[in-house]
């Protein structure tokens, strides 16, 4: 028959308990030695019996070295866990603080909008009223400042436009004055202006006089000149000229 499963509980029989302790202790020490050799691991095993007797095993008999290493690791682990716990606690604390602050701000915002005023007493309502009046005062002050700045800017632009308008008017007056002076000069010097203009308009004739026949007007003028020349001459000379 196979061996039955041992129930894991305290052995009440003192002798059986002592025998089991001796067997299990030897097996445990043997397993510690095997894992140390096979796996090249540092193993430290400490066992105290019911009577307080110490049984131990350490790789290369370096119990102190292993315990010191264990203490360093344990301390670092505790510090890390403590730091993480502290950080986690700080984050939770900060979250609660921020959440409360946000709720307070939202509540104040509703009060400023005239909502949820039923929960406020007389003193709180008076404080809210003073806060609103102070806010309105700052708002009006800022509004007036912006209005004054806007008016000053418009006045500056107005002055600039007026100066430009004056400059244009001055230029126009000077042009009108120059035009009037030119017209007056032309009125006081008509011959000079007309002769200069006619000289510009007319070109000198290029036709040969000796080759063209005399016009009727020219022959008439020539005959009149001859008749005038005959006046006062003696009759014999006139007949001689006519012949």
Curated annotation (Swiss-Prot):
InterPro entries in UniProt: MADS-box/MEF2_TF (IPR050142), MEF2-like_N (IPR033896), TF_Kbox (IPR002487), TF_MADSbox (IPR002100), TF_MADSbox_sf (IPR036879)
A Pfam cross-reference name: K-box
Top-level taxonomic group: Eukaryota
Biased composition (Polar residues): 179-192
Keyword Glycoprotein listed: no
UniProt region (Disordered), positions on chain: 173-243
GO BP: cold acclimation; negative regulation of vernalization response; positive regulation of transcription by RNA polymerase II; positive regulation of vernalization response; regulation of photoperiodism, flowering; regulation of transcription by RNA polymerase II; vernalization response
Subcellular location(s) of the protein: Nucleus
Name of the protein in its database record: Protein VERNALIZATION 1
Organism of origin: Brachypodium distachyon
